[in-house]
């Protein structure tokens, strides 16, 4: 369930951030900020649903998912193919995410 929450959180975070990017860098109208802010609020709420006692650990584990999702956004929305360094970096981050999520706690 955690990965599903992280996946949806990534969609809302990236979408919300892209709304600001589009307004400031692509000349989209200011009203793009409204759905961007709603999207970012949904992102933050979703992270509170992750079963964890520590916010920092939740955010750190989410980071790898965010990176992978951002590269998918790069490819599918911005029509730019991630290069081998993008893919390699994402794999390293996902390995770190797995260690954080599944490491023994004592």
Curated annotation (Swiss-Prot):
The keyword Cell inner membrane applies. Keywords: Cell inner membrane, Cell membrane, Membrane, Transmembrane, Transmembrane helix. It holds the Pfam family UPF0060. The chain crosses the membrane at residues 4-24, 30-50, 58-78, 86-106. InterPro entries: UPF0060 (IPR003844). It is a multi-pass membrane protein. It is found in: Cell inner membrane. The keyword Acetylation does not apply. GO terms for cellular component: plasma membrane. Belongs to the UPF0060 family. This is UPF0060 membrane protein Rleg2_1018.
